[in-house]
Amino acid sequence: MSHSAPPKPATARRSEALTGEIRIPGDKSISHRSFMFGGLASGETRITGLLEGEDVINTGRAMQAMGAKIRKDGDAWIINGVGNGCLLQPEAALDFGNAGTGARLTMGLVGTYDMRTSFIGDASLSKRPMGRVLNPLREMGVQVEAAEGDRMPLTLIGPKTANPITYRVPMASAQVKSAVLLAGLNTPGVTTVIEPVMTRDHTEKMLQGFGADLSVETDKDGVRHIRITGQGKLIGQTIDVPGDPSSTAFPLVAALLVEGSDVTIRNVLMNPTRTGLILTLQEMGADIEVLNARLAGGEDVADLRVKASKLKGVVVPPERAPSMIDEYPVLAIAAAFAEGETVMDGLDELRVKESDRLAAVARGLEANGVDCTEGEMSLTVRGRPDGKGLGGGTVATHLDHRIAMSFLVMGLASEKPVTVDDSTMIATSFPEFMDMMPGLGAKIELSDAR
């Protein structure tokens, strides 16, 4: 879908206690990879709990365009894959809409095939840099025709046979790591990724689960060496996708901020590379109880019981950024209601998300009376524990779903209402948000504000 749909502003107002039990939609990272690896594997893959947001569906469509058979059967998605090395050249450009993850991972997956593959996306995705993924692919022999600055629309022309490479990832990016590993699937020999700072590791865990010959070694300095032997066989799997921790963040922070709240969130992914927000909120004094911790499909999963809490400001260690990069906007909202100062640093990755997310958060906070300072890659927020004087502003969301949801959470606890200029793009990651939150007692509604 393109974001040419008319914008739908929404407003959140101060709410009474939020109570109830919810199950969060499936994790976006695991959902993307389930479609990709299922579409590539031999035999049948069955997925339940898939996040059916537009981003993930676009990844599924791309796999279909390259030969995978995908159908919905009740609550499950059934995929009959093509077999590793057997993707077909798509007849038309692959349209990823707003999905950076889907686009970048698929570039890795198809780049080493001897075929031409074109990628297009919406206005927001077409602004985002793709060079970080294209550079290692070029080293493997892939030719690239791209818009200026290595942006989409772009076309990859694969080599007859790709070269295996050893690639040191220059920034903390799971997408770059994953793209190189996926390119290695169709490359003879061993492709190695060296990762100085660990990022979410779903690609490694899931590829091993599908039968790839992949090993991970961590040296004494914490640097990870990930090796994949190409041209092996992948076998279809059964996957139950756990709830997305990045989506969990919104009802979780809302329950912490709205007085008297007591909310249980079921089936949340607790992979240690994704729990930076929960750790940070607990340091701030959040009452978050981890219940029924268990393993599901090789991933840590648990239920969370969250109660309203008085929060205090903290300094968030910059090395925690990779494990909570998508959660900083909603952490900034929590910080706005915490006593004292919260300092977030090492946020350079936020500048190249769906929007310049760091600037968007700072502008939104200022528009709603929050005392904050934006640095080059940092944000400092000075909180108002009672929410007095906060709210009353309209936030420019810049087509960014996480900005929209974060500021709607803010309005539930601020003295005055908070309006976001558009809520349509929330559907890219959390289509149920606008119904699920009012189900807990949140006062969020579409507004006529222009």
Swiss-Prot record:
Keywords: Amino-acid biosynthesis, Aromatic amino acid biosynthesis, Cytoplasm, Transferase. GO terms for molecular function: 3-phosphoshikimate 1-carboxyvinyltransferase activity. The active site is at 326 (proton acceptor). InterPro entries: Enolpyruvate_Tfrase_dom, Enolpyruvate_Tfrase_sf, EPSP_synthase, EPSP_synthase_CS, RNA3'P_cycl/enolpyr_Trfase_a/b. It holds the Pfam family EPSP_synthase. It comes from the Bacteria. It is found in: Cytoplasm. GO terms for cellular component: cytoplasm. The keyword Amino-acid biosynthesis applies. Its EC number is 2.5.1.19. Phosphoenolpyruvate binds at residues 28, 100, 128, 175, 357, 402. Its main location: cytoplasm. SUPFAM superfamilies: EPT/RTPC-like. It is an enzyme of class 2 (transferase). It catalyses: 3-phosphoshikimate + phosphoenolpyruvate = 5-O-(1-carboxyvinyl)-3-phosphoshikimate + phosphate. Pathway: Metabolic intermediate biosynthesis; chorismate biosynthesis; chorismate from D-erythrose 4-phosphate and phosphoenolpyruvate: step 6/7. One of its GO terms (biological process) is aromatic amino acid family biosynthetic process. PROSITE patterns: EPSP_SYNTHASE_1, EPSP_SYNTHASE_2. 3-phosphoshikimate binds at residues 28-29, 33, 173, 175, 326, 353. The keyword NADP does not apply. Monomer. Belongs to the EPSP synthase family. Catalyzes the transfer of the enolpyruvyl moiety of phosphoenolpyruvate (PEP) to the 5-hydroxyl of shikimate-3-phosphate (S3P) to produce enolpyruvyl shikimate-3-phosphate and inorganic phosphate. HAMAP family: EPSP_synth. This is 3-phosphoshikimate 1-carboxyvinyltransferase.
